[in-house]
Structure formats: C-alpha cells, structure tokens
C-alpha cells in the first residue's frame, strides 16, 4: 500500500486539477459511467467494487423503474442497493478509531446519509425495498462501509418527513448512525490495512 501511496503522490504532484478531473471523467466513460464526476457519482462504483455489487450507470433512475431509489444491484441477494457516502477529515479519525484522549476515548464516529427528495411518499416507499449502505471516505479513499438496518433508515426518514416544516426543502433528509449503536448496522467493508496503519496514531 505504501508504494501505491507514493505513486498517487507522484501523480498528484505532476498533474493539474483539470487533468486529474478529466482523467477521472474518461475513466468513468471507459467503464460505462457517463459524467462520473457529477455529485460524487464516482464513489458509487468504488463502493460497488468493495461490496461485489453492480453500480448503475446513471446517477439516478426515474420513478417507476425497478431500480428507482437505488444506486446499484446486489447479484448475490438479487436486490437493489442505495449508497450514501461522507468524507471525513483527519480529526475525525480520532472518532472512527475511538482513540485515547487521556483517561477516556473519543466518542465513536456518527455516519450520515443524506436522502434528497425523501419527503415524497413514492420515494419513501422505494427506499423500503432496498438495502442501504453508508460509505466513509478519507482523502477520497473508501475506508469503511456500513449496512444500516432498513427499518432504522425508514424510521428516521419518516420521522424527519413528519416533522418537516411547511415550505422547507424536500432535500437533506438525513439519517444518522452512531457507530456505538452496533445493533443498528453491520460492517459491510473495512479497509483493514488502513485501520492497522492508523488506529494507534
């Protein structure tokens, strides 16, 4: 992995933002994902690869389609999957690893998934029938993916919907999973090498 990091650092040094973004865009086209640089779409094939899923080519499927309310297909379960992701910064690694801070440890990380448009009954109904996966990215490297219980995801979405004030945005319906609440999720993927390299820092 350290050799990979050195190679990535060399690429980052030698190429401009525009060149790197263009390369990512072209990589998406070659792999069948048009406009992969839109709305962190590129994270979806990354998560799908970690989970053994097949990511949808388009950013979102329209209402009425089987894949509506999902980002990928899980062939092992023959079920659709919805992906959410968040980027964390260095200080949040303290929470991810629950590192020591004197006599106590840092509180566990809270992982969030933002559901835009999840204030429509049609969208809420679609989310009931798919699996949900929340990815955690550090420096755009996928370090953890959790699979929250669908019942808990729906409980929070429906609660937020019921308490939305009139006229407020129908976007940003946020589900939060505290990693200390292990009964609410399972770990679907963990970058073990990243954990070994960073957990004690």
Give a label for each model feature:
Residues 2-79, 83-201:
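Nucleic-acid endonuclease domains
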